[in-house]
Swiss-Prot record:
Coiled coil segments of this chain: none
Family to which this protein belongs: Belongs to the aldehyde dehydrogenase family. AstD subfamily.
Pathway: Amino-acid degradation; L-arginine degradation via AST pathway; L-glutamate and succinate from L-arginine: step 4/5
Lineage: Bacteria, Pseudomonadati, Pseudomonadota, Gammaproteobacteria, Legionellales
Full protein name: N-succinylglutamate 5-semialdehyde dehydrogenase
CDD domains assigned to the protein according to its UniProt record, in alphabetical order: ALDH_SGSD_AstD (cd07095)
HAMAP family: Aldedh_AstD
Record gene name: astD
Length: 495
């Protein structure tokens, strides 16, 4: 990789201006090399309070702006992203370590999200009116107010965008805190919003660590939209347990199962399993963590080919040639945590099929791992956010479903099977928000809702259903002229 110049932060984005930060130093690194990429500052308490103030000040005007005008700004944002497509894709790869092909796909998702969000808003929150004998029954929707969007590092542009765009379309103003791992990507996204001509104060960006996030959540806000770990989502939920008026949309990952049935095309099963478990270095919330495999010749052959495919998988920096399938996990610190988690599973009785190991010192580059947990005692129901698959063997299909449901989470689940009846049985009994058949567990569409049950979420699915948590319904009975009804209720006398 060629030597990179360190990106100096533009500062915090408040009231339509970049303001040089005064807080503690914040840095992001390229996880494939460990080199410093971006340098800036954490937002101070004063900067956070000021951002909240200007967001409230901008709210009335923005909420009263017509939907068509708000949509025009989002389309202007798309035009800016298009202009910066190559730069944004490269920056995503530099800051997350993703292969360039995957970052380019993410940029396309950012662009496509706007029209889908406009369509979803018009379908799910469009005003309706019904005439009755006595009055007009009207349904309209209002924005919540000032909402906080907490970004995730694995899709630093797309996932945040999936909250921001619907929130703005609905008339909310936004306080955006990106992941501390991906501040450079956030700055470019915000610059695109700035160049779209969006009015000052409608979106504000505050860079910082978890402490900044906590300060932000203590402000006068009306909603929090979060994508991340269960532990962080639970803390947010607990922080607002005495404030039921705050709407929370929490997407918190999962310990997702993928069941392999008796299939004819083993190579196809391996391919879809690779996309389920290893894509994005296992750092998608929908990645399959538990692979449930028949204890049969089919299962043995599948595991043999799956392990071989993992060994042959290309891993490296985004600009390596030939192109890698995956890059690093987000940091060296996280890589070490994942290796420690693997060690703990071995101590519980897990049998290593393919060891996950650190490939380059002081980076996030780790090789994929596979461990057989069939005979392990009390394996933890935890999400290991890495290219790491836990294998469980089963003897009959009912047992496979039982194993799949042995989790407190419920985000995604998948079945690879030639048997439609088995899929119908699987679909009926599996508890998850995304259930796929002969597709990777990571396969999702922005034209559908995205969210889970159990510890994976709080019944506020995003994607196409994000419009639902960005506005609240208002029911009105209306008539333009005040009149006394021809038939009055008994016992009521007017003089």
């Amino acid at each position: 990789m060629s030597k990179l110049q360190i990106i100096q932060s533009k500062g915090q984005y408040i009231n339509g201006e970049w303001i040089k930060g005064n807080g503690l130093i914040l840095e992001s690194t390229n996880p494939a090399s460990g080199t410093l990429l971006w340098q800036g500052n954490n937002a101070t308490d004063e900067e956070i309070a000021n951002a909240c103030y200007v967001a409230h000040r901008a709210l009335k005007s923005w909420a009263n702006t017509s939907f068509e005008e708000r949509a025009r700004y989002t389309k202007a944002f798309v035009e800016q992203v298009e202009k910066n497509r190559d730069q944004l894709a490269r920056l995503i790869s530099l800051e997350t370590g993703k292969p360039l092909w995957e970052s380019q796909t993410e940029v396309s998702s950012v662009i496509g999200k706007v029209n889908l969000s406009i369509q979803a808003y018009q379908e799910r929150t469009w005003p309706k009116q019904t005439e009755t004998a006595e009055a007009n029954a009207c349904l309209r929707f209002k924005p919540h107010g000032v909402v906080v969007v907490l970004g995730a590092f694995n899709f630093p542009a797309h996932l945040s965008n999936g909250h921001i765009v619907p929130a703005l379309l609905a008339g909310n103003t936004v306080l955006y805190k990106p992941s501390e791992h991906t501040p450079a990507v956030a700055e470019l996204i915000i610059q695109c919003w700035h160049d779209s001509g969006l009015p000052p104060g409608v979106i504000n960006c505050l860079q910082g660590n978890a402490n900044c996030g906590n300060t932000l959540l203590s402000q006068d806000i009306q909603g929090v939209y979060f994508t991340g770990s269960y532990a962080t989502g639970l803390r947010i939920h607990q922080q607002f347990c005495n404030r039921p008026e705050i709407i929370l949309a929490l997407e918190m990952g999962g310990n997702n199962p993928l069941v392999i049935d008796e299939v004819k095309d083993i190579d196809a099963a391996v391919y879809h399993t690779m996309l389920s478990t290893m894509i994005t270095a296992g750092q998608r919330c929908t990645c399959a963590r538990r692979i449930i495999v028949p204890d049969s010749q089919t299962g043995d052959l599948f595991l043999e080919r799956f392990a071989k495919a993992c060994k042959l998988m290309r891993i490296g920096s985004f600009d390596s040639q030939p192109e890698p399938f995956i890059g690093p996990v987000i940091s060296h610190v996280q890589a070490l945590k994942h290796l420690h988690a693997q060690k703990q599973l071995v101590e519980m009785g897990g049998e290593i099929i393919l060891p996950m190991s650190l490939l380059v010192e002081y980076t996030g580059l780790i090789s994929p791992g596979i461990i057989d947990m069939t005979r392990a005692k009390n394996p933890p129901d935890e999400e290991i956010f890495a290219p790491f698959a836990q294998i469980y063997r089963y003897n009959h299909f009912d047992e496979a479903i039982q194993l799949a449901n042995q989790t407190r989470y419920g985000l995604s689940a998948g079945l690879l099977s030639d048997n439609k009846d088995h899929y119908l049985q699987f679909y009926q009994h599996i508890r998850a928000g995304l259930i796929n058949w002969n597709r990777p567990t990571t396969g999702a569409a922005s034209s559908l809702p995205f969210g889970g049950v159990g510890c994976s979420g709080n019944h506020r699915p995003s994607a196409y259903f994000a419009a639902d948590y960005c506005a609240y319904p208002v029911a009105s009975m209306e008539q333009p002229l005040l009149t006394t009804p021809a038939q009055r209720l008994p016992g009521l006398v007017l003089e």
